[in-house]
């Protein structure tokens, strides 16, 4: 899913990038040896994955949407306490559509939001 030079966003107590090493897409090369990567993610954190179609969405002036705008939308969503994956993707979609305006879509645009919810143990 992650076909972008940019790391996925982590949105919880703040907005940051998921620390990860670059890899190639799954299935691209059957001989590729992927490295195991781990990160601590806290309950309630939303992970936003996206293709380069988001960062490279272009308006009629040939300006790109880029990470600054993605972070701006994510920070606004966090301030409004609207970081549920569906809400976050809706806000990001609206922001990119407003930015692009009447320009033709130059690339596919895919986003996926995942929210980590820690399972609580039942009371004894």
Where do the protein language model's features map onto the residues?
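Conserved subregion of the PPM/PP2C metallophosphatase catalytic domain
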Residues: 1-124
């Amino acid at each position: 899913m992650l076909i972008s030079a940019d790391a996925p966003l982590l949105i919880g107590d703040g907005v940051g990038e998921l620390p990860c090493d670059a890899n190639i897409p799954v299935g691209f090369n059957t001989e590729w040896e992927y490295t195991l990567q781990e990160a601590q993610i806290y309950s309630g954190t939303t992970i936003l994955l996206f293709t380069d179609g988001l960062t490279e969405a272009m308006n009629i002036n040939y300006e790109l949407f880029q990470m600054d705008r993605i972070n701006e939308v994510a920070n606004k969503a966090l301030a409004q306490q609207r970081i549920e994956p569906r809400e976050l993707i809706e806000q990001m979609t609206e922001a990119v559509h407003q930015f692009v305006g009447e320009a033709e879509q130059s690339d596919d645009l895919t986003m996926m939001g995942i929210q980590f919810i820690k399972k609580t143990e039942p009371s004894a």
